[in-house]
Regions:
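C-terminal transmembrane-bundle signature of multipass membrane proteins
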Residues: 219-304
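Fungal extracellular Ser/Thr-rich, low-complexity intrinsically disordered regions
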Residues: 1-41, 298
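Helix-loop junctions on the outward
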Residues: 90-125
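Membrane-helix boundary/juxtamembrane motif in polytopic membrane proteins
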Residues: 181-184, 202-226, 246-250
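Juxtamembrane membrane-interface segments at transmembrane-helix boundaries in membrane proteins
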Residues: 30-44, 112-128, 247, 252
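Internal transmembrane alpha-helix with an interfacial aromatic "cap," most often the third helix
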Residues: 61-65, 115-174
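First transmembrane helix
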Residues: 44-69, 88-91, 95
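Alpha-helical transmembrane segments in multipass membrane proteins, preferentially the mid-helix core
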Residues: 60-62, 168-172, 190-211, 226, ...
Length: 304
């Protein structure tokens, strides 16, 4: 039964505006119960094998080039071959699953209207890569110093800064809190020190050399420093801030190593061997060994 007059009221109130909720749905934020595992996939694994093969081929090529020249002019060839040999061994280890560990980190995610959350990450780290650099990059710096006639004092500072740079980078990689950026600052300072010793002092040492030799040193040293600049960039983007995947990191490091340890080695040796002036000639112990001529033996008696 309809109350008299109610039907007329319903007709007029049906078109009146109604209130709507002013507060939207509160987002649901669920803390990460399981850690996010960041590891290498097929792209990264194939990259490791490709670089290992390239470094093996380059090592054979460099040893062959070394055998074709006199021992007095073979020092650069030997150092370059050792660089690719160490790189081959390190990439072979990584390709077969050796020299790897996982870094555990916890990332804090702040929120405005709900409690903050934390997410655990497990990222695959190839520590043998740092061992590769600690051995090979001083040899690269020695090649640059020999090519440009850099003195021993400047070379020693450059090598020390190089070792500090990679040791600080390794420490920053496994540091869990904001202190990793302190170690990263040490990486930057070390890189600038290398750039000054090799770039500025090296340019001064070849200022009076022939144009061909000066051009070879300037371009070779400059190209190496430019590629070395990728190290702090990739380091910040991959293990420190985890902005890129492990596969992308692997490809980036592969490009870095192929250039500095492989292609630049061909550039150095071919440019050095074709140069009419400024070829490195090392005699003495390197080519002749220790001479015993004129040595006096103390303590021996005549007729003994």
């Amino acid at each position: 039964m309809i109350v008299p007059g109610m039907e007329e009221i319903l007709k007029h109130t049906a078109t009146l505006p109604t209130s709507t909720p002013t507060v939207g749905p509160i987002p649901t934020v669920t803390p990460g119960d399981w850690p996010v595992v960041q590891h290498i996939h097929d792209t990264g694994k194939r990259t490791l094998w490709v670089v290992a093969v390239l470094m093996a081929i380059s090592s054979i090529a460099f040893y062959s080039l070394a055998a074709r020249v006199r021992v007095q002019t073979r020092l650069l060839h030997t150092l370059t071959a050792l660089i690719t040999t160490v790189s081959f061994l390190s990439y072979l280890a990584m390709a077969t699953g050796e020299g790897v560990t996982y870094k555990h980190s916890v990332v804090h995610h702040p929120h405005k209207h709900v409690p903050d959350t934390h997410q655990e990450y497990l990222r695959e780290i190839f520590w043998v890569r740092y061992l590769n650099w600690i051995i090979t990059t001083p040899l690269i710096l020695i090649n640059i110093a020999l090519l440009g006639g850099l003195n021993g004092a400047n070379l020693l500072v450059a090598i020390a800064a190089d070792l500090i740079m990679f040791a600080a980078g390794l420490t920053a990689t496994f540091t869990h809190d904001e202190r990793r950026w302190v170690w990263y600052t040490i990486v930057i300072i070390s890189f600038l020190t290398i750039g000054f010793q090799v770039g500025i002092n090296g340019a001064r040492s070849v200022r009076r050399d022939a144009d061909q030799h000066r051009t070879l040193f300037t371009s070779f040293a400059g190209a190496n420093l430019l590629v070395f600049l990728l190290y702090p960039i990739i380091l910040a983007a991959s293990p420190l801030s985890q902005r890129i995947s492990v596969d992308a990191e692997t490809v980036a490091w592969a490009i870095h190593d192929i250039l500095t340890q492989g292609l630049f080695g061909y550039w150095l040796l071919l440019g050095h061997d074709s140069s009419e002036t400024g070829q490195l000639y090392v005699d003495g112990f390197w080519s002749q060994g220790i001479s015993h001529e004129g040595a006096i033996r103390v303590g021996e008696t005549d007729g003994a």
